[in-house]
C-alpha cells in the first residue's frame, strides 16, 4: 500500500472508525494516533488479501459451506448456507447511504461530544464506506463481524461507543499512548482503567461467544429507531412473502451494515410481537424474560434517554452489563444461521460437518401453534410461515419445538420419520428444524470447541453421563491436533507445507472420528433404550397419580361385574386383570372314546355330510317333490306326522300381517311385514319374563295377582272407552229416531273409528285351520273358494306340506280348480321366502293353461322381495306392463314396501311421488301406512304427522297397524316423546290389543328420553298382559339407564345405581338363557337318540330279512336298547358325581351290539352349533348400550375397555359402536391420536365401512394431530369411497396444507371428481323426468288427447273461475242496475261534487210537501 493511496483514504480514520486507532477525549477535542495502525499494517494487509471477497456474507468454502445429514457413510440430505454476497451484491447504494447517514447522526446526537465539522467529515467517510471496492475502508465493522469464521482475526466489539481491546493489542496501545500523549497522564490513567475493565469483559465475551452470533455493535443496538421506519417494515414484510424473488426484494432493505440484515429482521419481529411473547412462552420458566435481550434492553435504554448528559457513562455501563448477561445466557441457544436444501454433491466419507441423529420417537407438527390459536386466524395474520420459523429459531421455544414441514417439506421426506398414530401425543418430543445443530466442526475455532464441550444436553437419566464424558474426550483429541497445526503455522512454514501437513492430519483425524462415531452410535442406542424405559416408568407413575379414583368409581368398572358372572359349566369363564378369556370345560355327555376310531370317523363323516344341507333346502325339495310328483299314497294324508307345532286356537299370533282389501272389483291379500330392525332376535327360546330386575316391581306384581280388581292398568286416561260409548249411543239414537243433526255429528266420529282388520282376518283363516280335506269334501255346501281358503290357512299356520297334499288331492279327484287355487298355494313362497319355488309354480300355471292375473304377479313380486331380489321384482313389474296386465295400487304398495325392506328409502319416496304424479294413483290406508314406516327409518316425524293428517282429511280408516307405525316413527325422536303417549292413549281407547311390537316401540321412546318412571309403568303393563320381554327390549331398557345419566341433575349415586341395574339385567339374561338351553339340549338329544335308534333298526332289518325272525329281532333289539340306555344313564350320573374318577375311561361299546350310545352323544355334540352358548342372549346392541351408559356417566376409559369384552360375548362391534367411541374421543376427550388408532382398527379388523360423517370427523382429527401423512391417508380414503369434504373443509385444508403439493393436487382431483359425479346424477335425474313426461304424453295420445286437451276436472275448474269472475264484476256495478243504465263518466263526476244545483236538489234545498200544493 503506497503512501498516496494511504493518504487518499486517510479520511477513513475519523471518529466513526475508532475500531482500529486509539483516541483520547480531552476538552471536547480528539487527538488521533495512527502509529498503531502503521505498526500493524502487515497483519491487516494479510487479512485484506485473504478476506477481501467476504464482505457481508458467510465465508465461501466448498466443503465447509455444506451441512450433511448422514448415517454412517450414507448421506441422507445436504444443506447449504445462504450466500449473502450474491443476494446483496447489487444493493441500492443511495438508500443505504441515506440510512447510514441517519444512523450516524443519531449516534452523534446521543454522545453530545462531536462538533459540526466532525459530523460532516463522518458523513463523507461514511459515503465511501458504502463502496464495495477493495480498499482501506474494508477495515470496518464488516471485516471483523461474527460471520467471518477464523481463528487468526479477533473481532472488536463496540457496545455504546466504548472501546474493547483484544489481549494482543493492549500492551502496544498502552505504549503508544505513553509516547504520544504524555501530556494528559491523568486522563490516560482513567482511560486505562476503563480499558482494563473493558478488556476483561471482552475476553469473557470472546470465550463464551457462539460462532453464529451476529455482531452486536452500536448500530445494531440502535435499530429501534429504524424499526419505526415504515420503509423497513414494508421491506421486511415483502421479504417473507415470496421465496423465488428474494434476491430482488433484498434490494429494498436498508441497513448500515449489509451482513446485519438478518439480525435487524429478527429484532424487528421480536419488537413487533412482544405482546404475544407472554402467551407463547407460557410453558417456559417464569424468569425467562431475563433471557430476552432486545426488548428489555430497549426499554431500559429508552428510559435512560430522558436522563441528563452527565449520566451517559452510567447508562452505557448498564447497557454493557445488560448485553453481557444476555450473551452469557443465550450463547448456546441464539442461533441465527439459515440453511436451504441442496443436492448431494459431496458423497465422500470425510465430511466436515455432521448432524447428531435424532430420537426414534420423533414427531412432526404441521401448524404454527399447537392448539393455542385458531389456524385460520393465524393464516390471516401471517401471510407466510417464514415469520413463524424466525420466531421459532429464537432463544424462546415459542411453539413447543414444532417442525413446520409445510415450508420445509423435503426434510421429513428425506430423513424418513415414521408417523404412527400411537406417537401422536402431546407429551412426545417434537423437534424444530431451525434448531438442528452440528455435531463437531473440523474447521471450528477454540471457542466453539470449548463451547461444545461445555454444552449440556438435558438427559433425564444419570447413565447419560457416559455420553458426555466420551464427547469431552473426543473434543480434547481434536483440540490437540488442531493446536499442533496452529503451532506449525506460527513457526514459519510455507503455505504448501502447511497444506500438505494439514491434509495428512485431516485424514488421520477423519479415520479416528469414524471409529469414535461408530462407538458413539452404539452407546446412543443403548442410552435411548434406557431412556425410553425410564420415561415409561415415569409416565406410568404420573398417570397413576393423575388417575387416582375413588373406591366407588372403581367398583363401577366392567371387569368387577364380569367377575361376578355365574355361567353354566360348559361355558365357565375366568377373567384376569380385566381381560376376558374363555375356557371351556369338558362336556359330561362325552363319557369315553371308542376303541375302534376308524369306524367312528367314517360314521361321523357320513352324518356330517347329511347335516351340511340346510333345513330350508330340505323343505324346498320336499315341497317340490310333492308338487311335481302326484303320489299314489295320497289317502294316507291323515297319518302324516308334522314336526311343527299345532295351531293354538285362542292365543296364537302371526308374525306376518294380512290386510284384506274390501273393494268389490278384486279380493286379495296384501302382506305387509312388521317393521323390525335387523338386529332383533325374535326367538321363542330367548323370550322370557322380566324377573328380578326390580324388587319393588315383583312385590307389586304379586299384589296384582292376588286381586284381579286392583290391577294397575298402565298409562291409561279416563277417556279410554269414549269411542265405544259413542257407538252405543249412536245405535240407541238410531232406534229411537232422534234428531238427524245428532246422527250426522255421530257419524263423523264413527267413520273416524279405527278398524282392527288383522284380528278379523286371522279369525276367518282360523276356521279352516283345524278342518280336514275330507270333511269339506263330505259337506256339499263348500265350493272351490273354501278349498282355496283351506290351502291358504294350512300354509299360513306352518303346515305347508299338508297344503301341497291337499292341492294334489284336488287334482286327483278332478275338482275344478282356478287361478286362485294356485295363488293360495303360492303363499308358501312368501312364508318360506323362496323365489325359486314361486317361479316353478308360475311355470306350472302356464303349463296347465291358466292365465296369471294381477294377484299372481303380486305374490311373485312379494316372494322375490322377501328373498332380497328387488331387481327381479321390478322386472316382473315391467313384464306386467308389457303383457297389458293391470297394475293397481296393491302392486305399487308391494314394490314400495320392498324398497323399504331393502333399505332403499330415498328410492321408495321417489317411486311414491312418481306413481302419484304421473300414474294418477290415489293412495289408500295401506300405502300411507307404508310411507309412515319409511318415515320411521328416516326419523322424519314431521312428514309422518303430515301423512296422518292427510289420511284424516280424506276420511281414510286408521287401523291399529297405522297407529303402531306412527308410534314407531315418533319413538325415535326425543322431542316427540309426549306425542307418542298421545297416540298410545288413542290405541288403548279403541280397545285394541296390546302386542309385543307396540311395547317395544314404547320402551324405545322411554329409552331415547331417558325416562325411567314411564319405563316402569310400561313394564308393569306388559306383566299385566303377560307379554314376554325380548332381547331387543332388554337392550332399550339398558339404554334408558344410559340416557338418564345425560341429565346434569342426576347425582353420582344415581348414576352408579343405573350401572348396577344394567349389569343386573345382563345377569338375568345369562342365567335364563343357560337354564333354558339345558332343557333344549336334553330335548334335542332325546330326539336325536330316537332317530339314531330307528336307523340302526332299519340296518338290522335289512341284514336279517327272513320273515320268521322279524319278531325275534325286534324284541331282541328293544331289550338291548333298554339295557344300553339304562347303563348310559347310570354311568352319566356316576361321572357327574365323581368327575375326576377313572370311570371316564370306561368303554360302553359292545362288540356284539353295534349300537353305541356314546357314539350317539358324540355325534350329537358334533351337530351342535357354535353359537349355542349361554352368551347368545347378549348381542352387540346390548353391549353398545353399556358403552353409551359409561360415556354418559363420564367413565371414558371404561367405555373404551368395553371393546375387550366383545370377543368374550362372541360379538363384533358394529357401526354404532365406533360412532359412539369416535364422538367420545374427539369431542369429549379430545384425544385425536386415539381417534386415528381406532379408525385403523375399524378398517383392518372389522367389516364396517366408514360413512361421510365418520370420515369428516377422522379428517378433522388428522388435521388436529398436525400430521401430513395422516391427512393424506384420510383424504385418499375419502377419494376411494367417493365421499368429498365440504367447502368449509376444503378451505381449511387449503390454508393448512398450502405448502404440501400432494394435498393440493388431491383436493383438486376430488373437486373435479365431485363435479363429474354431481353432473352425472343431475343428468340422470333430468333424463328420468323427461322420460316420465314422455310416458305420460304417450298415455294421453292413446286416449286421443294432448297436453292442451282438457280433462273433466280442468273443465269444472274453468267454469268455477269464470263464474267467480262474473260475480266479482256484478259486485262492482250498482245494485239492481245493468251496465247500460250507468251514467256517462262526466255526469257521474258532477253528481259526486259538492255544491251546484244537482247537489242542492239532493241535499240542500228542502222540497215542498204534497199537501202544500
Swiss-Prot record:
UniProt key word Repeat = yes
One Pfam family from the record:
PPR_2
The annotated region (Disordered) lies at: 282-315
Q: Which Gene3D superfamilies match?
A: Tetratricopeptide repeat domain
Supply one GO molecular-function term.
mRNA binding
Q: Would the keyword Lipid metabolism be found if you checked this record's keyword annotation?
A: no
Q: Which InterPro entries match?
A: Pentatricopeptide_rpt (IPR002885), TPR-like_helical_dom_sf (IPR011990)
List the record's Gene Ontology CC terms alphabetically. cytoplasm
Determine the domain of life of the protein's source.
Eukaryota
UniProt feature, compositional bias: Basic and acidic residues:
299-308
Keyword annotations for this protein, in alphabetical order, are: Merozoite, Repeat
The way this protein is applied in practice is: Possible candidate for an effective malaria vaccine as determined by epitope response in sera.
User: Positions of the PPR repeats?
Assistant: 783-817, 818-852, 853-887, 888-923, 924-958, 995-1029, 1179-1213, 1214-1245, 1251-1285
Q: Family assignment?
A: Belongs to the PPR family.
NCBIfam families per record: PPR
Protein name (Swiss-Prot/TrEMBL): Pentatricopeptide repeat-containing protein 2
Question: Which species does this protein come from?
Answer: Plasmodium falciparum (isolate 3D7)
Query: What is the name of the gene encoding this protein?
Result: PPR2
Amino acid at each position: 500500500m503506497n503512501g498516496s493511496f494511504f493518504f487518499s483514504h486517510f479520511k477513513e480514520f475519523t471518529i466513526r472508525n475508532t475500531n482500529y486507532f486509539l483516541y483520547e477525549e480531552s476538552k471536547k477535542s480528539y487527538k488521533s494516533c495512527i502509529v498503531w495502525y502503521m505498526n500493524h499494517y502487515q497483519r491487516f494487509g494479510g487479512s485484506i488479501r485473504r478476506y477481501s471477497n467476504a464482505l457481508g456474507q458467510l465465508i465461501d468454502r466448498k466443503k465447509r459451506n455444506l451441512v450433511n445429514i448422514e448415517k454412517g457413510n450414507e448421506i441422507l440430505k445436504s444443506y447449504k448456507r445462504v450466500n449473502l454476497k450474491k443476494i446483496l451484491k447489487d444493493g441500492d447504494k443511495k438508500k443505504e447511504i441515506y440510512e447510514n447517514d441517519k444512523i450516524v447522526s443519531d449516534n452523534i446526537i446521543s454522545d453530545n461530544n462531536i462538533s459540526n465539522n466532525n459530523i460532516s467529515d463522518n458523513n463523507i467517510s461514511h459515503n465511501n464506506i458504502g463502496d464495495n471496492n477493495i480498499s482501506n475502508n474494508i477495515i470496518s465493522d464488516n471485516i471483523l463481524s461474527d460471520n467471518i469464521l477464523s481463528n487468526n482475526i479477533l473481532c472488536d466489539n463496540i457496545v455504546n461507543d466504548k472501546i474493547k481491546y483484544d489481549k494482543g493489542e493492549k500492551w502496544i496501545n498502552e505504549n503508544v499512548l505513553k509516547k504520544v500523549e504524555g501530556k494528559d497522564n491523568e486522563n490516560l490513567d482513567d482511560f486505562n482503567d476503563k480499558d482494563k475493565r473493558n478488556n476483561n469483559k471482552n475476553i469473557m465475551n470472546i470465550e463464551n461467544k457462539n460462532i453464529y452470533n451476529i455482531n452486536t455493535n452500536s448500530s445494531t443496538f440502535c435499530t429501534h429507531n429504524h424499526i419505526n421506519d415504515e420503509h423497513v417494515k414494508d421491506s421486511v414484510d415483502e421479504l417473507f412473502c415470496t421465496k423465488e424473488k428474494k434476491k430482488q426484494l433484498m434490494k429494498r432493505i436498508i441497513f448500515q451494515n449489509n451482513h446485519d440484515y438478518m439480525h435487524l429482521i429478527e429484532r424487528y419481529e421480536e419488537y413487533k410481537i412482544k405482546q404475544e411473547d407472554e402467551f407463547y412462552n407460557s410453558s417456559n420458566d417464569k424468569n425467562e424474560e431475563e433471557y430476552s435481550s432486545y426488548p428489555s434492553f430497549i426499554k431500559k435504554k429508552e428510559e435512560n434517554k430522558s436522563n441528563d448528559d452527565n449520566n451517559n457513562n452510567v447508562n452505557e455501563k448498564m447497557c454493557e452489563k445488560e448485553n453481557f448477561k444476555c450473551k452469557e445466557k443465550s450463547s448456546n441457544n441464539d442461533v441465527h444461521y439459515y440453511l436451504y436444501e441442496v443436492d448431494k454433491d459431496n458423497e465422500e466419507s470425510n465430511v466436515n460437518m455432521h448432524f447428531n441423529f435424532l430420537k426414534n420417537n420423533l414427531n412432526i407438527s404441521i401448524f404454527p401453534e399447537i392448539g393455542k390459536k385458531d389456524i385460520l386466524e393465524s393464516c390471516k395474520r401471517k401471510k407466510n410461515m417464514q415469520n413463524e420459523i424466525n420466531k421459532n429459531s429464537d432463544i424462546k421455544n415459542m411453539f413447543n419445538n414444532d417442525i413446520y414441514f409445510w415450508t420445509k417439506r423435503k426434510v421429513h421426506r428425506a430423513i424418513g420419520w415414521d408417523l404412527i398414530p400411537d406417537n401422536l401425543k402431546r407429551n412426545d418430543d417434537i423437534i424444530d428444524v431451525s434448531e438442528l445443530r452440528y455435531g463437531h466442526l473440523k474447521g471450528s475455532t477454540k471457542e466453539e470447541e470449548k463451547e461444545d464441550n461445555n454444552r449440556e444436553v438435558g438427559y433425564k437419566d444419570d447413565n447419560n453421563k457416559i455420553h458426555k464424558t466420551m464427547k469431552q474426550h473426543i473434543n480434547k483429541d481434536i483440540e490437540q491436533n488442531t493446536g499442533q497445526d496452529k503451532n506449525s503455522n506460527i513457526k514459519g512454514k510455507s503455505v504448501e507445507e502447511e497444506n500438505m501437513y494439514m491434509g495428512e492430519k485431516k485424514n488421520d483425524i477423519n479415520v479416528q472420528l469414524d471409529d469414535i462415531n461408530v462407538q458413539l452410535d452404539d452407546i446412543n442406542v443403548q442410552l435411548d433404550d434406557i431412556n425410553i424405559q425410564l420415561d415409561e416408568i415415569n409416565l406410568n407413575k404420573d398417570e397413576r397419580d393423575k388417575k387416582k379414583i375413588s373406591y366407588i368409581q372403581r367398583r363401577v368398572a366392567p371387569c368387577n361385574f364380569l367377575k361376578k358372572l355365574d355361567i353354566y359349566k360348559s361355558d365357565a369363564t375366568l377373567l384376569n386383570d380385566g381381560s376376558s378369556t374363555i375356557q371351556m370345560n369338558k362336556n359330561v355327555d362325552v363319557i369315553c372314546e371308542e376303541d375302534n376310531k376308524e369306524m367312528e370317523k367314517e360314521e361321523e363323516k357320513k352324518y356330517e355330510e347329511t347335516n351340511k344341507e340346510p333345513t330350508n333346502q330340505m323343505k324346498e325339495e320336499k315341497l317340490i317333490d310333492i308338487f311335481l310328483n302326484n303320489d299314489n299314497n295320497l289317502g294316507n294324508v291323515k297319518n302324516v306326522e308334522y314336526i311343527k307345532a299345532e295351531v293354538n286356537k285362542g292365543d296364537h299370533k302371526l308374525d306376518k300381517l294380512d290386510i284384506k282389501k274390501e273393494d268389490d272389483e278384486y279380493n286379495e291379500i296384501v302382506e305387509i311385514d312388521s317393521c323390525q330392525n335387523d338386529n332383533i332376535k325374535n326367538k321363542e327360546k330367548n323370550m322370557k319374563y322380566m324377573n328380578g330386575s326390580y324388587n319393588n316391581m315383583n312385590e307389586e306384581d304379586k299384589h296384582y295377582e292376588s286381586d284381579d280388581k286392583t290391577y294397575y292398568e298402565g298409562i291409561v286416561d279416563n277417556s279410554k272407552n269414549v269411542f265405544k260409548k259413542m257407538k252405543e249411543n249412536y245405535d240407541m239414537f238410531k232406534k229411537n229416531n232422534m234428531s238427524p243433526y245428532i246422527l250426522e255429528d255421530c257419524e263423523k266420529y264413527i267413520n273416524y273409528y279405527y278398524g282392527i282388520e288383522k284380528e278379523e282376518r286371522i279369525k276367518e283363516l282360523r276356521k279352516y285351520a283345524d278342518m280336514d280335506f275330507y270333511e269339506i269334501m263330505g259337506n256339499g255346501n263348500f265350493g272351490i273358494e273354501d278349498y282355496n281358503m283351506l290351502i291358504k290357512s294350512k300354509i299360513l299356520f306352518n303346515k305347508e306340506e299338508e297344503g301341497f297334499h291337499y292341492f294334489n288331492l284336488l287334482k286327483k279327484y278332478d275338482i275344478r280348480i282356478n287361478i286362485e287355487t294356485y295363488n293360495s298355494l303360492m303363499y308358501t313362497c312368501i312364508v318360506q321366502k323362496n323365489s325359486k319355488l314361486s317361479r316353478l309354480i308360475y311355470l306350472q300355471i302356464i303349463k296347465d293353461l291358466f292365465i296369471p292375473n294381477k294377484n299372481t304377479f303380486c305374490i311373485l313380486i312379494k316372494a322375490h322381495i322377501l328373498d332380497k331380489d328387488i331387481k327381479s321384482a321390478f322386472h316382473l313389474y315391467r313384464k306386467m306392463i308389457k303383457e297389458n296386465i293391470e297394475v293397481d295400487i296393491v302392486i305399487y304398495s308391494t314394490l314400495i314396501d320392498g324398497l323399504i325392506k331393502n333399505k332403499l328409502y330415498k328410492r321408495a319416496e321417489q317411486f311414491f311421488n312418481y306413481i302419484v304424479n304421473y300414474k294418477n294413483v290415489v293412495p289408500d290406508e295401506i300405502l300411507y301406512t307404508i310411507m309412515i314406516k319409511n318415515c320411521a327409518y328416516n326419523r322424519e316425524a314431521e312428514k309422518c304427522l303430515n301423512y296422518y293428517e292427510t289420511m284424516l282429511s280424506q276420511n281414510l280408516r286408521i287401523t291399529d297397524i297405522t297407529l303402531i307405525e306412527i308410534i314407531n316413527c315418533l319413538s325415535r325422536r326425543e322431542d316427540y316423546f309426549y306425542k307418542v303417549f298421545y297416540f298410545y292413549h288413542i290405541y288403548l281407547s279403541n280397545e285394541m290389543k296390546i302386542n309385543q311390537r307396540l311395547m317395544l316401540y314404547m320402551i324405545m321412546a322411554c329409552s331415547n328420553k331417558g325416562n325411567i318412571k314411564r319405563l316402569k309403568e310400561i313394564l308393569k303393563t306388559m306383566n299385566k298382559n303377560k307379554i314376554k320381554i325380548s332381547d331387543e327390549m332388554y337392550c332399550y331398557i339398558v339404554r334408558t339407564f344410559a340416557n338418564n345419566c345425560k341429565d346434569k341433575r342426576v347425582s353420582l349415586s344415581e348414576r352408579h345405581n343405573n350401572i348396577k341395574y344394567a349389569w343386573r339385567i345382563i345377569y338375568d339374561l345369562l342365567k335364563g338363557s343357560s337354564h333354558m338351553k339345558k332343557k333344549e339340549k336334553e330335548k334335542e338329544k332325546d330326539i336325536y337318540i330316537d332317530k339314531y335308534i330307528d336307523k340302526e333298526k332299519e340296518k338290522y332289518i335289512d341284514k336279517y330279512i327272513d320273515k320268521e325272525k322279524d319278531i325275534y329281532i325286534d324284541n331282541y333289539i328293544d331289550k338291548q336298547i333298554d339295557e344300553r340306555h339304562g347303563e348310559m344313564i347310570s354311568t352319566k350320573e356316576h361321572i357327574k358325581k365323581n368327575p375326576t374318577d377313572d370311570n371316564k375311561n370306561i368303554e360302553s361299546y359292545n362288540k356284539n351290539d353295534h349300537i353305541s350310545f356314546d357314539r350317539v352323544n358324540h355325534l350329537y355334540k358334533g351337530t351342535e352349533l357354535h353359537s349355542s352358548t349361554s352368551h347368545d342372549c347378549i348381542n352387540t346392541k346390548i353391549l353398545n348400550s353399556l358403552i353409551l351408559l359409561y360415556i354418559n356417566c363420564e367413565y371414558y376409559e371404561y367405555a373404551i375397555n368395553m371393546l375387550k369384552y366383545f370377543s368374550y360375548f362372541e360379538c363384533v362391534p358394529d357401526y354404532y359402536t365406533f360412532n359412539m367411541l369416535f364422538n367420545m374421543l374427539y369431542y369429549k376427550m379430545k384425544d385425536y391420536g386415539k381417534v386415528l388408532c381406532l379408525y385403523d382398527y375399524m378398517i383392518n379388523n372389522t367389516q364396517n365401512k366408514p360413512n361421510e360423517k365418520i370420515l369428516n370427523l377422522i379428517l378433522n382429527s388428522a388435521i388436529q394431530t398436525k400430521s401430513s401423512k395422516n391427512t393424506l391417508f384420510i383424504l385418499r380414503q375419502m377419494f376411494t369411497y367417493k365421499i368429498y369434504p365440504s367447502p368449509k373443509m376444503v378451505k381449511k385444508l387449503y390454508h393448512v396444507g398450502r405448502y404440501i403439493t400432494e394435498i393440493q393436487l388431491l383436493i383438486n382431483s376430488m373437486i373435479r371428481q365431485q363435479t363429474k359425479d354431481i353432473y352425472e346424477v343431475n343428468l340422470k335425474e333430468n333424463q328420468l323426468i323427461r322420460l316420465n313426461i314422455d310416458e305420460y304424453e304417450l298415455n294421453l295420445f292413446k286416449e286421443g288427447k294432448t297436453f292442451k286437451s282438457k280433462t273433466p276436472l280442468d273443465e269444472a275448474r274453468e267454469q268455477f273461475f269464470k263464474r267467480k269472475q262474473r260475480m266479482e264484476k256484478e259486485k262492482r256495478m250498482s245494485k239492481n242496475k245493468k251496465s247500460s243504465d250507468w251514467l256517462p263518466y262526466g255526469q257521474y263526476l258532477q253528481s259526486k261534487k259538492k255544491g251546484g244545483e244537482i247537489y242542492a236538489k239532493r241535499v240542500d234545498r228542502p222540497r215542498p210537501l204534497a199537501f202544500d200544493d
